[in-house]
A protein has these predicted regions:
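Short, flexible helix-loop junctions that flank or precede catalytic/ligand sites
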Residues: 1-315
């Protein structure tokens, strides 16, 4: 039996599409994730089959997903300066993340798990490739398993197979946004299902940001991921996007709706977390006040205080 791509330990796979060329990959093996390596020659036939499948699947599109020989990938195609065409295939793990096995300090993981009892908005932020989606999905799966209720996810593409039963009382419905659809329309439609939890893979439009904030302040617990270089940047980016649809006053809505913010950096030893949360039923919470007063840049002080408080709850 010929070797398949499922045996290559890749996170990202780079394959030329217009003609055969040397493929490269970024390994998921510890200590090797920061370098690109040449795909070994014994995988060439598998790479050739993958190239054909991607060309057939994407056609004129630049983004999409593929199930290929036991591997599910998110695809992003680019035309290069020399007119060559390449695709980056991000491997999608079909195993649902377990919050107890993601490498978080126990006191932080336990507090994040408890957020599932609340409503509001949980932002999971960080740079590309630092595990935002894994953490967000791990939280949602934990909430469903332990607290029950219905969840609707809105993704492009679906990255983990969450659909179906979770524990005794949890059920997840997964929606993959079609290319011609708007994220805001899918989110608005999801609200009619009266879900306990909503997971939005990424906020891409002002209207979607508006719907997300509306959902977070009307009894749902909403989880989403945000590309950002810092916790403050994550909040300011969401405000900037939502203001284009909602106008002034977004800070007040975000302040009322924010439940938790996770900023994640993946290191060789595991995830490094900056974490903040608001107190329930506390309009005077200092985090909410900073957001309302547009003083988000001062939030780092509270992140440090929260870290110390969780690490030493009796101190």
């Amino acid at each position: 039996m010929s070797i398949t791509l499922s045996e290559l330990p890749f996170i990202d796979l780079y394959v030329r599409l217009d003609q055969p060329d040397q493929a490269l990959y970024r390994s998921k093996e510890r200590g090797k994730s920061h370098i690109n390596q040449l795909v070994p020659p014994e995988y060439q036939l598998a790479v050739d089959r993958f190239m054909s499948a991607v060309n057939e699947g994407l056609k004129e599109n630049n983004d999409g997903s593929i199930d290929f020989e036991g591997v599910r990938c998110r695809l992003s195609k680019q035309k290069m300066s020399d007119n060559s065409s390449w695709v980056c295939a991000r491997r999608i793990n079909t195993v649902i993340p377990d919050m107890d096995k993601l490498g978080f300090a126990k006191h932080i993981a336990d507090h994040m798990k408890a957020l599932g009892k609340r409503d509001g908005l949980i932002l999971v932020s960080g740079a590309t490739g630092h595990g935002k989606t894994t953490t967000a999905v791990g939280l949602l799966a934990y909430f469903l398993r332990n607290y029950g209720g219905a969840a609707v996810t809105i993704e492009d593409p679906v990255e983990f197979m969450l659909k179906g039963r979770h524990g005794e009382g949890g059920h997840c419905f997964q929606v993959e946004v079609r290319q011609e659809e708007d994220w805001a329309v899918c989110l608005k439609r999801a609200l009619r299902w009266a879900p306990r939890y909503i997971y939005v893979g990424e906020i891409r439009t002002p209207k979607a940001a508006e719907q997300l904030l509306r959902a977070a302040t009307t009894g749902h617990l909403v989880i989403t991921t945000v590309h950002a270089g810092s916790p403050e940047e994550a909040l300011m980016g969401l405000i900037f996007l939502a203001e284009q649809a909602m106008g002034p006053g977004v800070q007040n809505i975000l302040a009322a709706g924010l439940t938790g913010l996770i900023y994640q950096t993946m290191k060789e030893t595991g995830p490094h977390i900056k974490y903040l949360f608001t107190e329930p039923d506390s309009p005077g919470d200092p985090i909410r006040s900073l957001i309302r007063e547009n003083k988000i840049g001062m939030m780092s002080t509270y992140i440090d205080r929260i870290a110390a408080r969780l690490a030493n709850p009796s101190g």
